Amino acid sequence: MKQYVVDAFTDKVFAGNPAAVCVMDKWLADRTMQNIAIENNLSETAFAVKEGSAYHLRWFTPGGEVELCGHATLATAYVITRFVEPELKTVAFDTLSGRLTVEKLDDLLKMDFPSFQLKAVPVTEQMIEALGVKPTSAKRTCTSAFLQAGKTAFYISN
């Protein structure tokens, strides 16, 4: 298995947002993918396996699997269209967040991205302890939480 480190959102080395990318013939055990992410110590390590005409894509942080990661999706599309299937103009990814597509436009990649509805969630003791104040409301998506305490708002990303 080859592993790439790609800096998303830039055309300069050591800039942008780095992600590790592993395009594989078959899945590794979840624990192995988690250990690779821990060893990489980047915000995300992406793992992709081609299944039919699309790639199944999963993202792991050093702390666990996440449901969505934009920069690692772009990084994976870059690796696929540059090294794995250079003739491909559109890459489809099946993910925990649904189908994502990335279109290759000359030297650029254009990605669709899902929008998420905010869901109200109960205020927990963990939230109060983390913020040092009791939020008056709490809402979340699959990737983020939004907490309000009076006129102050908090955004927390997974």
Please report, for each region that a protein language model flagged, where it lies by residue.
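Active-site proximal loop and beta-alpha junction motif in alpha/beta enzyme cores
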Residues: 1-68, 74-158
